[in-house]
């Protein structure tokens, strides 16, 4: 089912972005 696959891929990309951005945000938060 294609729409579901597309949503799944988008969710995975968002989660990957959060995983990468999370530590950076934490470091910036500590620095300020």
From Swiss-Prot:
Q: What protein name does the entry list? A: Cecropin
Extract one GO BP annotation from the record: defense response to Gram-positive bacterium
Listed A to Z, the keywords are:
Antibiotic, Antimicrobial, Fungicide, Immunity, Innate immunity, Secreted
Q: Which family does it belong to?
A: Belongs to the cecropin family.
Query: Per UniProt, what is one Pfam family of this protein?
Result: Cecropin
Where's it mainly located?
Answer: secreted
GO CC, any one term = extracellular region
What tissues express this gene product? Hemolymph.
Organism per entry:
Oiketicus kirbyi
What is the annotated localization of this protein? Secreted
- InterPro entries cross-referenced by the UniProt entry: Cecropin
């Amino acid at each position: 089912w294609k729409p579901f696959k597309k949503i799944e891929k988008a969710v995975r990309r968002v989660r990957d972005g959060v995983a990468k951005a999370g530590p950076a945000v934490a470091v910036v938060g500590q620095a300020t």
